[in-house]
C-alpha cells in the first residue's frame, strides 16, 4: 500500500535532561522511519519528529508510566 505521508513521532519519559530527551526521541523516530522504509512501506514523504517528554500518555511518577511514555507513534495518511 502507498501513502501520501507517514509521520513518525518519538517520545521519552521525563527522566534526564531536556537536551538528552530531545535527542533520544529524535533517534527513536528516525530508527522507526528507517525500519518502515527498509521493510517496504511506501510513502511520498516520511516525517520523523522529536517531542521528548511532551504529551505523556501516563504518569511519569511510576516505572510503568515512564515505560509507556517511551514510545513512537506512527500516523499513516492516505492520498
Task: Set out the residue ranges of the language-model regions.
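Short beta-strand/loop motifs in extracellular/secreted proteins, especially
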Residues: 4
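Periplasmic OmpA-like peptidoglycan-binding domain that tethers envelope proteins to the cell wall
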Residues: 9-79
